[in-house]
């Protein structure tokens, strides 16, 4: 049951005050504790306490982005930082966004809506609007990060599998004093042209073993959406594995055919 102070905060449109309640990260706007719902989500929370840069890699619905945003909101409410900065690469718009109608907010909203959704679960609407007007919470496409130094912040890069190698290096080197960075991505949902290397894949290879950087891998066991999501992920994994096998067999047959032609 909710404490009287928590109920009062909700009625007055304030975020409930955070207490150290075991695994609770923050309270939702309805007063419900937001907690890690799987072993790997808990690991993400624990690694956040020990490292300034985290990479959380896993399938859709595994809670990587939601948990990351909850950690950022907790740090802001506990006055450990001064701002939260959320970003994702707008692949569909080539990171330029110039062809879309409307002002900047109208242009970026479609790509960043999932981040708004998570924030709205954790911060009352009026307070969230105030935070955004004061730039305490900033949500912007990755291209808008160039040239900035990000101090006193938790910075989250979502959908990082769709960054180029240059973009992710640019992002990671924006890190300033008293700042934590969380990079999330799903290796099965790369939307880049096949000729381009995912910046996330390259970064994972280059940064492995660097002190102060933690890597958390989530999987289908961590999926906390509708149970069908897990089945859908499994079905696609089987399909993709089958496609790889068929492609491999086709390549072998083509190679044998070429060798026979050379003989004759």
Mark where each language-model region is:
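Interdomain "pre-motor" coupling segment immediately N-terminal to P-loop NTPase/helicase cores
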Residues: 1-21
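Conserved adenine-nucleotide phosphate-binding loops and their immediately adjacent elements
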Residues: 21-33
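Short acidic, low-complexity intrinsically disordered linear motifs used
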Residues: 250-254
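A cross-taxon signal for low-complexity, glycine/charged-rich
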Residues: 255-262
């Amino acid at each position: 049951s909710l404490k009287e102070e928590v109920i009062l905060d909700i009625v007055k449109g304030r975020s409930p005050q955070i207490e150290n309640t075991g695994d609770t990260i923050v309270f939702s706007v309805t007063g419900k504790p937001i907690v890690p719902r799987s072993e790997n989500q808990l690991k993400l929370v624990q690694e956040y306490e020990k490292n300034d840069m985290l990479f959380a890699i896993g399938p859709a619905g595994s809670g990587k982005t939601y948990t990351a945003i909850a950690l950022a909101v907790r740090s802001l409410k506990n006055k450990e930082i001064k701002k939260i900065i959320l970003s994702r690469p707008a692949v569909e718009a080539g990171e330029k966004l110039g062809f879309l109608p409307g002002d900047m907010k109208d242009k970026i909203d479609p790509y960043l809506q999932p981040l708004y959704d998570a924030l709205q679960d954790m911060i009352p609407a009026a307070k969230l609007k105030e935070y955004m007007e004061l730039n305490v919470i900033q949500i912007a496409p990755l291209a808008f990060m160039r040239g900035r130094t990000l101090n006193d912040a938790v910075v989250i890069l979502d959908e990082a599998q769709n960054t180029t190698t240059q973009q992710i290096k640019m992002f990671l080197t924006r890190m300033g004093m008293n700042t934590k960075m969380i990079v999330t991505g799903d290796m099965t949902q790369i939307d880049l042209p096949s000729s381009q290397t995912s910046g996330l894949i390259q970064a994972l290879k280059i940064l492995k073993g660097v002190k102060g950087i933690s890597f958390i891998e989530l999987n289908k066991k961590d999926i906390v959406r509708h149970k069908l999501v897990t089945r859908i992920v499994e079905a696609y994994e089987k399909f993709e594995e089958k496609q790889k096998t068929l492609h491999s067999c086709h390549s072998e047959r083509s190679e044998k055919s070429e060798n026979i032609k050379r003989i004759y």
